[in-house]
Amino acid sequence: MRKIMEERSLVFHRKGMPSPGIVARAAILLIWLAPGLAFGQDQTKPLIKLVATGGTIANTLEGRIPIQQTIADIRKNFPETLKLLDSVKLEVIDIIRVGSGSFTSKEFLDIARTVNRVIQEPEVKGVIVTQGTTTTEETAYFLHLLVKSNKPIVVTNSQRRHGTVGNDGDKNFVDAVSVVLSEEAVGKGVLVVHNQTINSGREVLKTSGHPGAFLSGMHGVLGIIEADGVSFYRAPTRRHTSNSEFDINTITTLPKVEVISAYYDADPGLIQAAVDLGVQGIVLNGLTASGGPHRAQQPLLERLAEEGMPIVRTARGGMNNRVTVNPQDKFIAGDNLLAHKARILLQLALTKTSDLKEIQRMFNQY
């Protein structure tokens, strides 16, 4: 119990944190929560672990607030949510309070380890991760590849600050609870819930700073959340979560992989600079539709591939574009993954092997 309270208290001791007034209100809220360390004390209710990492969903115009305050305000301001929220136990684990645009591999690994640990607890129904929108799609895909469970795991967020006009975070959080409770969410991998839609962690992309900006390209959403409940219309077909060969328990650091873009007048010196920095692999955000490099980049990339460095071709046209294997070169085809997601998969692949054929197999399967 002490450990959990210490985890929650971390949020109040980081540099640049809330104003004294916000801290005081949060302290009162924590005292209210302390007896049971959860919203809802009935042991027969489904238990949802909430892994909180900050983000706009836990920010107001006055500054940062704990996610517990966000939930308390939802309960107070929207009594129609009480039936749902009172039907579950919510336990909060505050692990990070950093803007998601500042996340490093350490934060990603910490989140993955935490989610993987708590999801294994037999009494846990599922996990909700709240974070900033900036890297939601990367967090979701990272967890999608690493967490070993069929239980529902939902990442949600907010584009507008809590308590402001048009705030979307309150609805997103309530919808996330509904999705975790849905039996249809079991075995679907890591899901991103935003603007009443359910997206796969593999495909979702933030397209703007507006509510409703999380989309999945031509593939479409997995499902939707409406007044009468949660509805799924398709399921991921690529390997993920419990069917993944990647194991967070064996990974302490991530290999260095950089993304290089193709464009006119592209200078191959940038590729050489990445090599000089010690990269173990390169993802090319290449030309649509081939995912190929600019002509000036081609010789150096081909030489690196011949020497055994994995060079993954992706297309800057986005997920509506599929890059296929070219038997004439040794580049790895990134399929329809966006460059920054291909980077995640390549990093994890390199924790297992440096064999180019094996890495291509992984890109074919994930």
What spans do the regions from the language model cover?
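Short acidic, glycine-rich surface-loop motifs adjacent to enzyme active sites
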Residues: 121-136, 277-290
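Short Gly/Thr/Asp-enriched flexible loops that form oxyanion-binding sites at enzyme active sites
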Residues: 129-151, 294-301
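ATP/NTP phosphate-donor binding region
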Residues: 41-118
